[in-house]
């Protein structure tokens, strides 16, 4: 399994993939965090769906990580795309057959690939957290947001909690991408269906009837990153999100073990 992890990591650390993915993650992280502070007095809102996040919220102990928590859903979508592409392209390029010759254990291959991609995702999460918190501190003075509580013991506790929540959310998004890659065996199909569902279909359903968002998988995973929301509790999102991911992973694993490797 160690060899599978290193083999997968060798592909993940290619400059075109690693730097490109990191660039996308930092772009959305910087954009979300910057808007949060520069538009703090805007009547159009400074957060998702036009919500207003005021100084009284950002001045709390967890204010330094608020921007990072807000971008967790977008980081998750990036992870979904990477996991889906790395999984499905084994079928597209026919490399899975070669892997099985050297390592016949399909479960070992699957777990090894998942571990390597989890490490990749966690690195992105940590870097994004550092950038977001740094930007928040730099922009706090301009936005007239007090940072007195940010770096106290309570503040560091909130940072750690947010980091854990975002990491869980991003890895869950990634596993969803891996499941789609195993089911569809096509990078384009897996990515397009995953992104289309999370960004468009769920929002359309939510616009028609907001209660639908209480049960949509993408909504649950995004809420996990945010530590809960006014509409969905953290425990509800974590329980339901974990259930979706677990069921999908079991189905995809069974199919991966039993299906022919040909695309």
Residue ranges of model-derived segments:
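Aromatic- and glycine-rich beta-strand/loop motifs that create alpha-glucan
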Residues: 1-27
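Short hydrophobic, aromatic-rich alpha-helical segments embedded in or entering the lipid bilayer
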Residues: 209-229
């Amino acid at each position: 399994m160690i060899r599978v992890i290193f083999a997968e990591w060798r592909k993940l650390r290619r400059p075109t993939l690693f730097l490109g993915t990191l660039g996308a993650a930092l772009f959305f992280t910087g954009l979300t965090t910057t808007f949060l502070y520069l538009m703090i007095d805007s009547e159009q809102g400074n957060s998702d769906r036009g919500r207003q996040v005021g100084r009284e919220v950002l001045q709390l102990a967890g204010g330094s990580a608020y921007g990072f928590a807000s971008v967790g859903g977008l980081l998750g979508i990036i992870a979904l795309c990477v996991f889906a592409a790395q999984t499905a392209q084994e079928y597209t390029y026919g490399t899975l057959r070669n892997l099985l010759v050297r390592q016949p254990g399909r479960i070992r291959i699957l777990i090894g690939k998942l571990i390597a991609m989890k490490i990749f995702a966690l690195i992105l999460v940590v870097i994004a957290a550092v950038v977001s918190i740094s930007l928040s501190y730099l922009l706090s003075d301009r936005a007239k947001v007090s940072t007195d509580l940010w770096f106290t013991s309570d503040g560091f506790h909130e940072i750690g909690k947010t980091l854990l929540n975002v990491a869980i959310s991003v890895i869950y998004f990634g596993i969803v991408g891996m499941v789609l890659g195993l089911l569809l065996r096509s990078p384009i199909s897996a990515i397009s269906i995953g992104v289309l569902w999370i960004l468009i279909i769920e929002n359309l359903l939510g616009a028609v009837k907001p209660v639908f968002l209480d049960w949509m998988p993408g909504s649950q995973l995004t809420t996990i990153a945010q530590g809960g929301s006014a509409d969905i509790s953290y425990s509800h999102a974590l329980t339901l999100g974990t259930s979706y991911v677990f069921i999908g992973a079991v189905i995809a694993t069974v199919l991966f073990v039993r299906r022919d490797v040909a695309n």
